Amino acid sequence: MEIITDIAPLRARLRHEASVAFVPTMGNLHAGHLSLVRIAQKHASCSVVSIFVNRLQFAPHEDFDRYPRTWSDDCRLLEEQGADIVFMPDEKTLYPVPQEFQLLLPPVADTLEGACRPGFFRGVTTVVLKLFNIVQPHIAVFGEKDYQQLQVVHRMVDQLNLPVEIIAGETVRDEDGLALSSRNNYLDATQRQEAGELAHHLKQIRDSIASGERDFPLLEQLAAEKLSKRGWVVDYVAVRQQHTLLPVAASDSSLVILGAAWLNQTRLIDNFLLTLP
């Protein structure tokens, strides 16, 4: 496995590869990330994983400074997984001058995470587009856990005619249903025991809809109330159309149930997909 920190040597290394699959990460890798790497390895002759904590997608009051940085462990895991290249640029490499150019985002980025975290998707699309231009992958793999991010990236690729195929990797969960996330490391032992409740209530909504319930606002309200009673601070619980993330109409059959909530000082997000017959 090669560790590359600058743009020119990375491009030189990749120039003659028949196919390149790319997994962008912010590090602090876990089994969910490694599942994305395995998908990448199945689809291309060369797998590239980037590790970069992107300041642009953090608001000033958010956790940029304390976001877990575990570079040595990350590289060990990636080497064990058989990744070909780890791209680890520093901030001056990706942002040598102030980043003045940014994208005008589509409506799908305005709701849910976009409403709760203004500027988040602007930062995400900026760094992903820069990384796509640097790596020039044929395939890029993103996790379904960050479902809205996945939809935003899909639109960016489609509408800007970027020559990369986006592949989604399924969410990896612990035994209690908690979606694996680097921010799970913020949880203490007691909070970790409670953290699976978000997934539990979203899954309950999914199962209720699958059983015929169609009062979506009521399902959202009940789940949010149950979480609040357990001490969570809920940003949103929402049943949406999978591709547009708009509220569901009676004719929609492809749904996603999304939630974001705070457990003490840790913000967790999750989602479950549902396709109705």
Curated annotation (Swiss-Prot):
InterPro entries with a match to the protein in the record: Pantoate_ligase, Pantoate_ligase_C, Rossmann-like_a/b/a_fold
Q: Which residues cross the membrane?
A: none
Q: What SUPFAM superfamilies does the annotation carry? A: Nucleotidylyl transferase
- The EC number(s) given in the record are 6.3.2.1
Which PANTHER family does the record associate with it? CYTIDYLATE KINASE/PANTOATE-BETA-ALANINE LIGASE (PTHR21299), PANTOATE--BETA-ALANINE LIGASE (PTHR21299:SF1)
Superkingdom, taxonomy of origin: Bacteria
Name a GO CC annotation attached to this entry.
cytosol
Query: What is its EC class?
Result: ligase
Stated role: Catalyzes the condensation of pantoate with beta-alanine in an ATP-dependent reaction via a pantoyl-adenylate intermediate.
List of residues binding beta-alanine: Q57
The compartments listed are: Cytoplasm
Annotated signal sequence is: none
**NCBIfam families registered for this protein in UniProt:** panC
GO MF terms here are: ATP binding; pantoate-beta-alanine ligase activity
Fetch the HAMAP family from UniProt.
PanC
**Lineage start:** Bacteria, Pseudomonadati, Pseudomonadota, Betaproteobacteria, Nitrosomonadales
UniProt keyword terms in alphabetical order? ATP-binding, Cytoplasm, Ligase, Nucleotide-binding, Pantothenate biosynthesis
- BP GO annotations: pantothenate biosynthetic process
The UniProt subunit note reads as follows: Homodimer.
Q: Give the protein's recorded name.
A: Pantothenate synthetase
Q: Where does (R)-pantoate bind?
A: Q57, Q149
Q: Which family does it belong to?
A: Belongs to the pantothenate synthetase family.
Chain sites annotated for binding ATP: 26-33, 143-146, 172, 180-183
Q: Specify the pathway.
A: Cofactor biosynthesis; (R)-pantothenate biosynthesis; (R)-pantothenate from (R)-pantoate and beta-alanine: step 1/1
